[in-house]
Amino acid sequence: MAFLRQTLWILWTFTMVIGQDNEKCSQKTLIGYRLKMSRDGDIAVGETVELRCRSGYTTYARNITATCLQGGTWSEPTATCNKKSCPNPGEIQNGKVIFHGGQDALKYGANISYVCNEGYFLVGREYVRYCMIGASGQMAWSSSPPFCEKEKCHRPKIENGDFKPDKDYYEYNDAVHFECNEGYTLVGPHSIACAVNNTWTSNMPTCELAGCKFPSVTHGYPIQGFSLTYKHKQSVTFACNDGFVLRGSPTITCNVTEWDPPLPKCVLEDIDDPNNSNPGRLHPTPNEKPNGNVFQRSNYTEPPTKPEDTHTAATCDTNCEQPPKILPTSEGFNETTTSNTITKQLEDEKTTSQPNTHITSALTSMKAKGNFTNKTNNSTDLHIASTPTSQDDATPSIPSVQTPNYNTNAPTRTLTSLHIEEGPSNSTTSEKATASTLSHNSHKNDTGGIYTTLNKTTQLPSTNKPTNSQAKSSTKPRVETHNKTTSNPAISLTDSADVPQRPREPTLPPIFRPPASKNRYLEKQLVIGLLTAVALTCGLITLFHYLFFR
């Protein structure tokens, strides 16, 4: 029982304390006032205090009092503290001032803002000003007023064109007129004006290559707006020839470099077409092409075939035992007959061919078989023999070549005959082919003629110029001899001056010959000496200037 009484006592005491705290008045609720005697904490209920106006407020009364009431409220103060007012902010040129707060717009805590007229923009640190207590304790605005400046635009840019007037900058509503260079068309407005925020009233125009290509409509022609050249925004109207109808827009306009809408088309008029404005009109006669082909709508005629292109082939109805024979055409080719004919001709030529007397061709042919050697120089004829490996290696037919005649008045000379001996190495029989004697007109001069001899290294004819003694001895006729006892066939060269040849042209001396190495060395040393002298001279001049003129 005692414990219960003690608990109730504690709860009652706590409630009374809380109730007393709630009955106090806060100093913060005194708007525009503050305690004349500063103190901390809240004011108890029923207590009366002296007040004064806060900063930014003013009153005409000397003493102001207020009492704390039940519920934590204050009684009405005996005098009113009113807000102080800031001075008139004034007007702004090319703009206006906007006041906020109604009647208290110029009083303590109020704010004002500035707005410029169209075509102007604000210039200043702050666009909003507040009424506040200044450094001296007087009411003042928070900042200096801004001002309105006219809008400006930068210089425009246009390629392949120009604009007028040309200025460093343009103010609001200043107009600029554009024009393009020759050969270009202006696409866009011809004039624009400066707007707000460094912008223009429209997008910048451009200068494009002027004109469109000449419009060509097949089976059509222009009836209005014909011109050789078409500029931007220029139009042309088309019509079709008789027998053709227009598909598309008859009038097209040049848009920069393209036609808008696209070019129309002229098509053949169809009498069954319900959209045909002229029913019953006949189709025009199509033009014949040079090759004879005729082309019409839904009509195509193949060109006639040539008679020689027609081939007749045998046909069988049923049960063919052998394939039919293909008849040859007028220009046909019989492969079997031709092959047999060619084979027979080759055999006849091999049988009837005789060795030729041209010495150069014969030597070349024998060299290819590899059966010739060089005999002693004292021999008086040229003996060539070869051993064929088969019957097919008979002496081939060598075409004769006529030796040119250089001098018709020169005496006739006889060349050594060529003897060709062929046969198997183990057989006593041999086929002898004696080359006919060649007669040439040799040209004589003081130094002797030029003749062809067999080169010992290459085993081929070469051109030599004999000495006077050789030239004199070569005038004697040559006698053909054959060495039949020799087992090894060989080539014997006796006289190297047999075939006259055209003399070679002399070798010209070189146009430019490099200078001797000694002269070039002297020139190099001379250049080095000159450069050294120049360097020493410059050094002496610099030293002289440093010593006497510094």
Swiss-Prot record:
The record's Gene Ontology cellular component field reads:
host cell membrane; membrane; virion membrane
Q: Which InterPro entries match?
A: Compl-Cell_Adhes-Reg, Sushi/SCR/CCP_sf, Sushi_SCR_CCP_dom
Tell me which UniProt keywords the record has, alphabetically.
Disulfide bond, Glycoprotein, Host membrane, Host-virus interaction, Inhibition of host complement factors by virus, Membrane, Repeat, Signal, Sushi, Transmembrane, Transmembrane helix, Viral immunoevasion, Virion
User: Where does the record say this protein resides?
Assistant: Host membrane; Virion membrane
Family matches, as CDD domains:
CCP
Coiled coil where?
A: none
Q: Where is the composition biased (Polar residues)?
A: 288-302, 312-321, 424-440, 450-476, 484-495
Q: Where is this region: Disordered?
A: 269-338, 387-408, 420-516
Topology with respect to the bilayer: Single-pass type I membrane protein
Q: Where is the signal peptide?
A: 1-19
Q: Name one GO biological process term.
A: symbiont-mediated suppression of host complement activation
PANTHER family according to UniProt:
COMPLEMENT COMPONENT 4 BINDING PROTEIN, MEMBRANE, COMPLEMENT COMPONENT-RELATED SUSHI DOMAIN-CONTAINING
According to its UniProt entry, the function of this protein is described as: Inhibits the complement component of the host innate immune response. Regulates host C3 convertases, accelerating their decay, and acts as a cofactor for factor I degradation of C4b and C3b. Also binds heparin, and therefore may play two distinct roles when incorporated in virion membranes: immune evasion and host cell binding.
Question: This protein is called what?
Answer: Complement control protein
Q: Which organism is it from?
A: Human herpesvirus 8 type P (isolate GK18) (HHV-8)
- Which taxonomic lineage is given here? Viruses, Duplodnaviria, Heunggongvirae, Peploviricota, Herviviricetes
Q: What is the primary gene name for this protein? A: ORF4
